[in-house]
Each structure stands twice: as C-alpha cells, then as structure tokens.
Amino acid sequence: MSERIKQLMVKRGITIEELSRETMIDMQTLNKIIEMPDESDVTTIKLIALVLNVSIDELLDEKGGEDNAK
C-alpha cells in the first residue's frame, strides 16, 4: 500500500504536507502509515483514500492499476 499511496500522491500532485493537512494526520503518523501500512487503522486509511479520491480497494492495490478517480 505504501507504494500505491506514493503513486497516487504524485498523480494528484499532493505533497505529504498537503496530505497531512487535508487528512488532519500529523506528519510523523502519516509517514509511519505510508512506511508501515499494516499497523494503520481503518479510519485513517479511509481518510487517506478520501483525500486521494480513490476507493480503499484502489489504495490497497499494490499493482497500481488504473483508478477511477476523475
């Protein structure tokens, strides 16, 4: 999931600082989520998916396939 989050951030032109601000997740926590996603809670993952405008399934898809975000 960490690579997928990074891919989606690049695709949408969102920096980690912007993602932190928009999700209201502090930078330290967000970095931990991105680097060690298995330890993240569902609510946090939902917030990240919402800000990146993708479904949770798309966020968790490590293949980085085509997403439906517009």
UniProtKB/Swiss-Prot annotation:
<protein>
    <recommendedName>
        <fullName>SPbeta prophage-derived uncharacterized HTH-type transcriptional regulator YopO</fullName>
    </recommendedName>
</protein>
<feature type="DNA-binding region" description="H-T-H motif">
    <location>
        <begin position="16"/>
        <end position="35"/>
    </location>
</feature>
<dbReference type="GO" id="GO:0003677">
    <property type="term" value="F:DNA binding"/>
</dbReference>
<dbReference type="InterPro" id="IPR001387">
    <property type="entry name" value="Cro/C1-type_HTH"/>
</dbReference>
<dbReference type="Pfam" id="PF01381">
    <property type="entry name" value="HTH_3"/>
</dbReference>
<keyword id="KW-0804">Transcription</keyword>
<dbReference type="InterPro" id="IPR010982">
    <property type="entry name" value="Lambda_DNA-bd_dom_sf"/>
</dbReference>
<feature type="domain" description="HTH cro/C1-type">
    <location>
        <begin position="5"/>
        <end position="59"/>
    </location>
</feature>
<keyword id="KW-0238">DNA-binding</keyword>
<keyword id="KW-0805">Transcription regulation</keyword>
